[in-house]
Amino acid sequence: MDTTCRCLLTPTIQPVLLKMLYRLVAAILLLGAVQATINCAAIPTSLWCSNKDLEAKCGFASFCDKHRAATHNQKINITVLIEALCPDCQNFLTKQLYPIVFKNFANYVNIELVPFGNAKVLEDGTIKCQHGEEECSINKFEGCFIDSMQDQSPLPTLSCIEESLQKKVEFADAVQQCFEKLQIGGDIQRLTQSCLVSKLGADLQNKAAAATANVWPEQHKFVPWVIINGVSLTSFQGFQNQLPTLLCEWYSGDKAIPYCEAALKLKYKKASIRSFF
């Protein structure tokens, strides 16, 4: 009987294919075991909406759909509690918030500055500031300037002034130099000056005091203090220097933020170089 057409594996090929089959079966069994044993309650909340399969398996889908609907193409609100002569506030404004966040994320965030910080409103209504009377005067000026700028961002000018103060430039000189450098118009200058000598200046300081006291759900413990979308958390403050990275993670829109794309490409490039060597 002719047996040349039997459907048998040749001796040289059979072990290879069997090994591949064993590996495939093992992978399927392992995947099933991982899926069966995953503890959804132990997954960090920041990862809940990062993968559709994860959302479906752990029951996160409904929450994630609501989150996406509420945040898609929406600017992220950043509120920063500051005080004028605080070195850490000056560093944050001049080295992080203005040169990195504002310049690269201006179309994706709303930035609000609250110049009051650790000051206290005394029983007689006067305000006592952590770094003395000069700080109170500058806080008041910054509040008036912010109000006078209306729809324009005060951050470039305030960052300029704070950088000058870091260099021990007199406040009046710093204001004049920065107004000239950033071409602040006469109307805004007059509005700011009028605010300083009127009841409005005091009202704005009291408003800043109330805004600082009423942050939620946790009170500020130091400055600068960063609040994201109205939420004040002590645990977040340790990540102030990672704010650009977090904004890249949090923002959800039709188009990626150019800064984030560039940062990701640079990261992959560095990783490729390391893996090559």
Curated annotation (Swiss-Prot):
Main location: secreted
UniProt superkingdom: Eukaryota
UniProt subcellular location: Secreted
Positions annotated as glycosylated: N77
Signal sequence segment: 1-35
A GO CC annotation given for this chain: extracellular region
Key words, A-Z: Glycoprotein, Secreted, Signal
GO molecular function list: oxidoreductase activity; oxidoreductase activity, acting on a sulfur group of donors, disulfide as acceptor
Family note: Belongs to the GILT family.
PANTHER family, per database record: GAMMA-INTERFERON INDUCIBLE LYSOSOMAL THIOL REDUCTASE GILT, GAMMA-INTERFERON-INDUCIBLE LYSOSOMAL THIOL REDUCTASE
UniProt name for this protein: GILT-like protein F37H8.5
Organism: Caenorhabditis elegans
